[in-house]
Amino acid sequence: MSDDTKKQDTAADAEVEKEMEGVPEHLRDDRGSEEDASDDLSAALESLKSDLEAAKQETLYAKAETQNVRRRMEKDIQDARTYAATGFARDILSIADNLARAIDAIPQELREDEKFKGLVAGIEATQRELDKVFAQHGVSRIAAMGLPLDPNQHQAMMEVPTDEVEPGTIVQEMQAGYMIRDRLLRPSMVGVAKKPD
C-alpha cells in the first residue's frame, strides 16, 4: 500500500471514530452483528423448515388415520346391514328344528289318512315358507351327510365304527347347521365314521 492510501485510511478511520463517539459499544461492531444476525436467521430458518416437515408428516398421518377410520366405519355399517338378522335367525332355528321333527314324526299311515292330510300339508307348507324366508335373508343349511368333517362347519358329537365309508366322513346328522351368508350361524351336530376296533 502506498503512503497516500494509508493516510486516507487513517483519516477515514479517525472520522469514523469521531462519529462513533457516544454510540454504545455493542452497537459499534456492525460486521459481527451482521454475521450473528445471519447465523440467527439461518438457525431460525432451519428450525422453521424442520417444524414444517414435522407438521406435514403429522398432517399425512392424520389424513391416513381419518381414511382408515372411515373405511372401518363403512365396513362396520355394511356388516351391520348384512348380518343384522343374525340373532333373530339363530333364535328361529329352534322353530325350524321343531317343524322338521314334527314332519319326521308323522307316520306314513297318518299322512295318508284323510283326517290328517290337511294338518300334514299345513306343517309341510310352513316348513317350506320358513326355508324360503331363510333363503331371502341369506340363511342356508350346511350340507353334512357323506362329506368329510369340516371343523369350521361341523361339530363331531360321536364316532361311529364302520367299514362302509372313509374314517372322518359324516354318517349321521343329529342337528342341522346353518350359515348366514359367509358366517357360521350354528354348526351341524354330527356323527363321524371311524375304523372299527
Swiss-Prot record:
Xref: NCBIfam families: PRK14140.1 (NF010738)
Single GO cellular component term: cytoplasm
Keyword presence, Zinc-finger: no
SUPFAM superfamilies named in the record: Coiled-coil domain of nucleotide exchange factor GrpE (SSF58014), Head domain of nucleotide exchange factor GrpE (SSF51064)
Organism from which the protein derives: Erythrobacter litoralis (strain HTCC2594)
PROSITE patterns per record: GRPE
Highest rank taxon of the organism: Bacteria
Function: Participates actively in the response to hyperosmotic and heat shock by preventing the aggregation of stress-denatured proteins, in association with DnaK and GrpE. It is the nucleotide exchange factor for DnaK and may function as a thermosensor. Unfolded proteins bind initially to DnaJ; upon interaction with the DnaJ-bound protein, DnaK hydrolyzes its bound ATP, resulting in the formation of a stable complex. GrpE releases ADP from DnaK; ATP binding to DnaK triggers the release of the substrate protein, thus completing the reaction cycle.
Feature: compositional bias, Basic and acidic residues: 1-31
Family as reported in the entry's similarity comment: Belongs to the GrpE family.
Disulfide bond annotation, renumbered to this chain: none
Pfam families: GrpE
Gene: grpE
GO molecular function: adenyl-nucleotide exchange factor activity; protein homodimerization activity; protein-folding chaperone binding; unfolded protein binding
InterPro entries: GrpE, GrpE_coiled_coil, GrpE_head
GO annotation terms (biological process): protein folding
Gene3D superfamilies: 3.90.20.20, Head domain of nucleotide exchange factor GrpE
UniProt-recorded name of the protein: Protein GrpE
Leader sequence segment: none
Protein keywords: Chaperone, Cytoplasm, Stress response
Subcellular localization(s) per the UniProt record: Cytoplasm
